């Protein structure tokens, strides 16, 4: 899959995946979603983001963990 809204630039944020070249790491967006922040609130607090950015960040994160060995859980 090609992610048109995710950029990885070694000269920006140490190469951390970011949204559209902004200094907004994908991980930050994912954390906000995981903490229960509605997309509308994320967009309100970060007006440079668009709804599609949040959606693509979620897809990117899902793909990033899809075929990786995951840490063991307590179950």
How would you name each of these model-derived features?
Residues 11, 26, 37, 72-74:
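A periodicity- and composition-biased signal for non-globular, repetitive helical segments
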Residues 48-75:
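C-terminal structural segments of small proteins and small subunits
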């Amino acid at each position: 899959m090609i992610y048109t809204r995710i950029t990885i630039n070694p000269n920006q944020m140490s190469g951390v995946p970011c949204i559209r070249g902004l200094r907004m790491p994908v991980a930050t967006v994912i954390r906000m979603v995981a903490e229960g922040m509605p997309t509308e609130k994320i967009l309100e607090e970060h007006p440079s983001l668009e709804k599609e950015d949040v959606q693509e960040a979620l897809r990117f994160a899902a793909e990033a963990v899809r075929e990786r060995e995951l840490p063991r859980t307590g179950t």
